[in-house]
A protein has these predicted regions:
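Nucleotide/pyrophosphate-binding catalytic subdomain
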Residues: 3-223
Length: 223
């Protein structure tokens, strides 16, 4: 998707879960991006493989005591750990700590009894899929010699607090994109960001509905 934004011609790419489901898929996606060297790319990425479904199980185990939420989360962690170990020969790569921190925060939430609505908890947990996948792809792209910036979409795509079906605040989002995204393209050619999620003014995470990654790509093209 090609569009013109604030004097910058850029392409928006969207990679779904199947496109980054394992190390081989990530390598293929990165090879595609490397083919556009010198062009401005905004890359929207979904959670890896069936991670969204797996994280939904974590939420249900936690909220309805259907199973052990920590065990279910560990399965998600192990899946991503295997992908990272296949992509990065050096275990000192910062991506390992960054991804681990996301899981640690989730474990902390699971340690407490539910204090919020199901939809709120859903968004805080299920959104990890996109945050983690983009960290991994961004780090691998950097390792392959393609400088890029990992953008936390929650800082620029502002929504209301209708959890699981959040509505975009177009005025705020456009202002933040102008302020934060456009200047980045003066430093690098590639921005990696998340589909499916947004943020509230209270710094909570929201999701945009089950096919939200496609929606995110369209939002950036519109803005």
């Amino acid at each position: 998707m090609l569009f013109y934004f604030s004097g910058i011609v850029m392409k928006v790419f969207k990679f779904g879960g199947a496109s980054v489901k394992d190390a081989t898929s990530v390598k293929n996606a990165v090879e595609i991006l490397k083919g556009f060297k010198g062009e401005k790319l905004l890359v929207v990425i979904s959670a890896m493989g069936k991670t969204t479904n797996a994280l939904e199980k974590v939420v249900n185990d936690y909220f309805f005591s259907k199973g052990n939420a920590h065990t279910s989360l560990k399965e998600v962690r192990d899946y991503h750990q295997q992908i990272m170990e296949e992509l990065f020969s050096e275990k000192t790569n910062p991506v390992f700590d960054k991804v681990n921190n996301f899981f640690v925060e989730a474990d902390w939430m699971l340690d407490e009894k539910p204090q919020h609505t199901y939809s709120f908890v859903y968004d805080q947990i299920v959104s990890l899929g996109e945050l983690i996948s983009t960290c991994i792809v961004s780090a691998y792209l950097e390792q392959q010699g393609c400088s890029n910036i990992w953008l936390d979409v929650r800082d620029v795509l502002m929504t209301d607090n209708t959890y699981r079906e959040a509505k975009v605040d177009w005025q705020k989002s456009e202002m933040l994109v102008q302020k934060q995204v456009v200047p980045v393209f003066n430093r690098v050619d590639v921005i990696i960001t998340q589909g499916f999620i947004g943020g509230t003014s209270e710094n909570y995470t929201t999701t945009l509905g089950r096919e939200g990654s496609d929606y995110t790509a369209a939002i950036f093209a519109y803005l």
